[in-house]
Amino acid sequence: MVYSYSEKKRIRKDFGKRPQVLDIPYLLSIQLDSFKKFTDQDPTGERGLEAAFRSVFPIKSFSGNSELQYVSYKLGEPVFDVKECQIRGVTYSAPLRVKLRMVLYDREAAAGTVKDIKEQEVYMGDIPLMTDNGTFVINGTERVIVSQLHRSPGVFFDHDRGKTHSSGKVLYNARIIPYRGSWLDFEFDPKDALFVRIDRRRKLPATIILRALEYSTQEILDLFFERVEFKIKKDTLVMTLVPERLRGETASYDIKDAEGTVLVEAGRRVTARHIRQLEKTNTTELEVPVEYIVGKYAAQDYIDPDTGEVLVSANSEISLEDLAKLSLAGIKELSTLYINELDHGAYISDTLRIDPTTNRLEALVEIYRMMRPGEPPTKDAAEALFQNLFFSEERYDLSKVGRMKFNRRLSIPDDEGSGVLSKEDIVAVMKNIIHIRNGFDEVDDIDHLGNRRIRSVGEMAENQFRVGLVRVERAVRERLSLGDLNELMPQDLINAKPISAAVKEFFGSSQLSQFMDQNNPLSEVTHKRRISALGPGGLTRERAGFEVRDVHPTHYGRLCPIETPEGPNIGLINSLASFARTNSYGFLETPYRKVVDGVITDDVEYLSAIEEGRYVIAQANIEVDSEGRMVEEQIACRHKGESTFMRASDIQYMDVSPQQIISVAASLIPFLEHDDANRALMGANMQRQAVPTLKSEKPLVGTGIERTLAVDSGVVVAAKRGGVIDYVDASRIVVKVNEDELRPGEAGIDIYNLTKYTRSNQNTCINQRPCCSVGEPVVRGDVLADGPSTDLGDLALGQNMRIAFMPWNGYNFEDSILISERVAQEDRFTTIHIQELSCIARDTKLGSEEITADIPNVGESALSKLDESGIVYIGAEVKGGDILVGKVTPKGETQLTPEEKLLRAIFGEKASDVKDSSLRVPNSVKGTIIDVQVFTRDGVEKDKRAIEIEEMHIAQARKDLGEEFKILEEGVLSRARNLLLSAGFTEAQIAALPRKDVLVQVIDDETKQTELEQLAEQHEELKADFDKKFEIKRRKITQGDDLAPGVLKIVKVYLAVKRTIQPGDKMAGRHGNKGVISKINPIEDMPYDEQGNPVDIVLNPLGVPSRMNIGQVLEVHLGAAAKGIGNKIAAMLEDQREKGLAEVRNYIKQVYELGDEVQQRVDIDSFTDDELLRLANNLKGGIPVATPAFDGAKEKEIKQMLELAGLPTSGQLKLFDGRTGNEFERPVTVGYMYMLKLNHLVDDKMHARSTGSYSLVTQQPLGGKAQFGGQRFGEMEVWALEAYGAAYTLQEMLTVKSDDVNGRTQMYKNIVDGNHQMQPGMPESFNVLLKEIRSLGINIELDQE
């Protein structure tokens, strides 16, 4: 493998045995691709905004004299960029402008004669835009739209599993689900009649819908039944024989062949042998006794040819009298319905008998009454209602997916067709459900991923947009009919408000639009790849059963079987598997390698769950020889959702990678294959809660996916093009682009601005740090700067800690964690949290609030950190209760005493009519002010601080753009100098030229002169461009802010809090091994090894066996080896000054070559000495290793690594007690584990109440930290005190400490006076109880005696 310059800085040793056929696809593509389809112009009009417009336009007036047509749309440029939107708290969106054409037709002339056409661009609201990282900025906060897994449109056949009826009979049902429109259900009742429901309303006999579709009784019977033909003879009947129909029947008469030989005697059962005999003798007719016809049903109406009277009506039961009538009327032939109990049930026939309707109109009226009970039906209304239900394109749409699923399920050859239902469609569904009831077909598996599809952002946004457009459509149609159209323009017809409101509602408050989980890069990526079954049009938590939540065979390679939340949402919220993607229909697909004649090829094909069922698919870990042939005879594989063994020649596909079944978060867990699934689930979920530490550290034991994840998440800065690093500082990196990657006429400089100390959604700190230096070559995709939780471009969620598995004085009882003081001293788990506190000055009825340093009754010391505008300085260290922004609010006029009036008159207006409402630091917080933003309403005078901030921003913008300009100008000038050199100028001449004169020299060579002129032109353009950019920036910075009504000014203060690790914080490993820190132990008390090195963390060994997450033990061993190798390299580097690099080179080579059949090849010999030194220096802290899930390091390889590191292969060391110096009685497992600090910090949870607010009704203290509430003293706690007989304590708890209003006030006074006594009174909740009993009409009074 070829490594780039920056990749050579640190190479992770990979233990993977399988070749990487397919790289993990871009992780955010599910979001970005979907939204791109929504916003991009689609000439076919099948998706996105284009489809929404085409589905609603043209809008015709009621009279048909005018219409509004859609021509095209375009999205404008957003006003603010993403960062500005976040600071200002506005939505990152672009204006949507639509070109509409209004066509007026001439009433007098022939139809379709155009009188007038007006075209105009109309503004139709703002469309929120997706950022490059797949998020939306809505009102200044980053949000993610989670994809939804919903039931695909189409037709589904199911049964109730015998739960509906007490008899336990299985009742079948069919359901046609459109993309939009009414649901149509068919269902059997316990008596085997077929019923229909529309939109889950009252059920009707299913034949009503057939009558409404203009089928007569006769046609209905012909659709669903075969006929049995009889010829009427004098005393007997002759039946046309279809031998197969006799199977299983008991003969009620002798069955004879054509020669009269008795084949089956009366009373005997007809078997397959008898049928074969009948077929052999070619018997086509059978004589049956007259009684045989009794109980059969007529297949058609029989009419007396003379009188026209109906002798026997279709579907009526035939008796001997009916037969006699037919015989008399001279009818010689009779058809009956072929029905048998076994596989040709009389379902439709029975249904027709309970059908109250006889013709189409009655059926339509019946449907109308069911849909609109209480309304009087008219013929037109009934027809229109039925027509609109399933046959109108405006009201009903199966969608492309729905039509495809519908046709495939009913074996209709074409995948495409109309979006509405046809008569044939409904009949086909009814035929199929009868087919299933007859036992010829199976019901569908509703949890199969072929029946559930993904609805992503773009599609949901399009649906919401269409909802908005439909609302507008009604208004437009009315205006077209009412207004004077000659005066109106398209703009006057369209009101963009409903569209904006629909889109805003979706992005702002839909259940699937979620506040982005921004704890760390992994949590961002996972959130964007989340697939939820909840949300509008999906399931609800309460109604979702076990089957929906369970892992299904079709989840393989599509949804992760591990990563799902614990709790009520388990199984309803899933994560996309690493390689999965959605196809054009929205179904999940996963890639497989094609296998041809037992040879595995590198061709990769994506298969959906439906297609996968048809093939035989082997797993990725089968043994293969050098030519790609499978070694074993019998191969473990999957076929039709079952796991089985098959011959190698039968295999058609093979998995792409062993990691393809799990999600990104699960594939970050090393040795996942050795962990119990429940613990792996916790491990995957807890990695998302890891807080970025102050100094990120890459995991020693990783899985090799860390880099992909860090780059795809967008938190690191990756090079867009190759080149050389030209300039680096803390906030900017400049790359001089390679000549061959330049676009013509370009300056050849890429500038990357870094994000510094910004607040994330979870109040953690986002900060980017450069990880390259000037002069380094870079290639496209190289990491230039690390973000939060990344280290040299690798995801780094925690820290590598030296761990010992042993009990230690009970401090690691029940998963507690004992850590060394050194961990806290070295700031290993110190995190920075940034809080945003806002102070809003409003216009009140009594006057406007004012932000000022002049606050009544506040001493000088409290104002020491404020400037003259009353706003805190940047860099001030503040603690709980300090004033951050001084603000005064006008008070209502109070009655003044004569004395006060006199004083007022003498000393003028005093500030007694305002009260202090300043922004203060919350109680438990202590930190440093890192930024202040002031937003002022347009037209309100800016204070001094706001102007200062503005000037600072302008100066910063000028500096940024100036430097950018300088760099770009230098690029142009250097190319001009090179040109002059090639034209014969000497270096001295060029050096002597002033900068501005370089571009105005005269060269003899014409082509070079032209080139120089082009460069001069480019320089002028750059200058103009710089001025324009600066002007735009300046205007943006100085313009007033669009604040909410009544708000004059907002001051936002950003406070950085540094949190070191302390007892009570929650920590975890990556294998679901979580615990709370119980004690921070002095270094000298920690157990230490023979070299005197103490351990960092002591974990309880009992946490491993019962939890079955053995992966952590293997990680500790491999981590010890990796660290040991690093120590050896460090020692060799110390010696290399004398011995040279040969020893280091050989040792590193040995390490990378270790392992059987390992795919990774690192050619250490090709490294220059400098590259090798840099690599060795980066490996000093330990060599990072990758052990991919299901393809990781074997026990043998871990032992070889331990040997190479010079450590015992048992992985255990002798340890000594730090307190006594005595050796522990047996060796202890010691090694390195990657530990995470989770975002469950004791500082955010600890809380104590003195006095505070009370509930209005019960007068009891509120609960919870946010309300500064108390602790609940519940009934069990009361029982405990009762059991101890602690009467006074109990009385105190239930009265003065809770809801005895007078008692608690009195007690407060007593304590202040130093009189420690209490007088308990009546608890308020007792009065509430009395009131509640009285509300039931029972008078209850308290006898005070």
From Swiss-Prot:
Does this entry carry the keyword Nucleotidyltransferase? yes
Task: Write out the GO MF terms.
Answer: DNA binding; DNA-directed RNA polymerase activity; ribonucleoside binding
Q: Which controlled-vocabulary keywords does the entry list?
A: DNA-directed RNA polymerase, Nucleotidyltransferase, Transcription, Transferase
What broad class of enzyme is this?
A: transferase
Task: Supply the InterPro entries for this chain.
Answer: DNA-dir_RNA_pol_bsu_ext_1_sf, DNA-dir_RNA_pol_bsu_external_1, DNA-dir_RNA_pol_su2, DNA-dir_RNAP_su2_dom, DNA-dir_RNAP_su2_hyb_sf, RNA_pol_bsu_bac, RNA_pol_bsu_CS, RNA_pol_bsu_protrusion
Question: Can you name a GO cellular component term?
Answer: DNA-directed RNA polymerase complex
What is a single Pfam family found in this protein's UniProt entry?
RNA_pol_Rpb2_3
The enzyme's E.C. designation: 2.7.7.6
Instruction: Quote the PROSITE patterns the UniProt record gives.
Output: RNA_POL_BETA (PS01166)
**Catalytic reaction(s) noted:** RNA(n) + a ribonucleoside 5'-triphosphate = RNA(n+1) + diphosphate
Q: Name one GO biological process term.
A: DNA-templated transcription
What NCBIfam families has UniProt attached to this entry? PRK00405.1 (NF001616), rpoB (TIGR02013)
Protein family per UniProt: Belongs to the RNA polymerase beta chain family.
How does this protein assemble? The RNAP catalytic core consists of 2 alpha, 1 beta, 1 beta' and 1 omega subunit. When a sigma factor is associated with the core the holoenzyme is formed, which can initiate transcription.
Q: What does this protein do?
A: DNA-dependent RNA polymerase catalyzes the transcription of DNA into RNA using the four ribonucleoside triphosphates as substrates.
What HAMAP family does the database record attribute to this sequence?
Answer: RNApol_bact_RpoB
Entry protein name:
DNA-directed RNA polymerase subunit beta
What is the native source organism of this protein? Answer: Shewanella sp. (strain ANA-3)
Q: Which gene name does the record give?
A: rpoB
